[in-house]
Amino acid sequence: VRAVVLGQDPYHGPGQAMGLSFSVPRGRKIPPSLRNIFKELAADVGCAVPSSGDLTPWARRGVLLLNTTLTVREHAANSHSKLGWQMLTTYVVEECMRAPQPVVFLAWGRPAVKLIAGAKARAEHALGELGGEERAAASAALACKFVLASTHPSPLSASRAAGDLPAFLGSRPFSRANELLSECGEEPIDWSLPA
C-alpha cells in the first residue's frame, strides 16, 4: 500500500459499487463524485479524462480504495454509517499506519478525515509504550505517513471549503501525494487511467 483513498460509503445505486471506493464497473455511467475526481486528476497532473470509472489500475499500483462504511442501503447514501463498519476500517487504516513504507492518506470528506486523524493519534500514543529499537522503528515508520485532507468530491461539497478542510477541487491530491512519496525516496504513483 502506497496510498489510501478514504471515502464515505459505497455508491447506493444498483450495479455501481464494486468493492473499491469511488470506482464503478466498466460500462457504467460515471457518478458525479468520480467525475469530479477525474476533473481534479486532469487539472492536477494532466491525465486524460478516463472513459471508464473502473479504478482497478490504481489498486494494482498500490492505492487502497477504501470507504469508512462498507455497505449501504439501496438509494440511501450513508444509511449504514452507524452499523460499526468504522471499527474494521479504522483497524485497516491503523495497520497502514504501522507499515514500514511511506503511505499517503487521501481523506476526502469529514468522516474520512476524522477516522484517519484518530488512527494517527492512536499510533502516536502507542509509541510511548514501546522501547528501544522497536520504538525507533515505529517512529520512523510513522514519520513517513502523510494525510492530505479535503472536502468530499461530491458535487455538494467539491468546490467549497468546509471549516479547516480545503475544497476538493483545486486541492491537488495526486501531485501532492507523489511529492510526499518522492521526498521519502519512493517512486511516484502513476495516476493515469485508460482514456
Each PLM stretch: what is its role?
Residues 1-2, 61, 101-103, 145:
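Short coil/turn segments at beta-strand junctions that form active-site/ligand-binding loops
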Residues 8, 68, 107-111:
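Short, well-ordered beta-to-alpha junction loops that form the rim of enzyme active sites
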Residues 54-58:
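Active-site cradle of extracellular carbohydrate-active enzymes
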Residues 1-50:
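Adenosine ribonucleotide-centric catalytic and binding domains
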Residues 49-52, 104-107:
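A short glycine-rich, hydrophobically flanked beta-strand micro-motif that places a catalytic Asp/Glu
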Residues 30-33, 40-46, 70-101, 111-195:
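C-terminal capping/extension of enzyme domains
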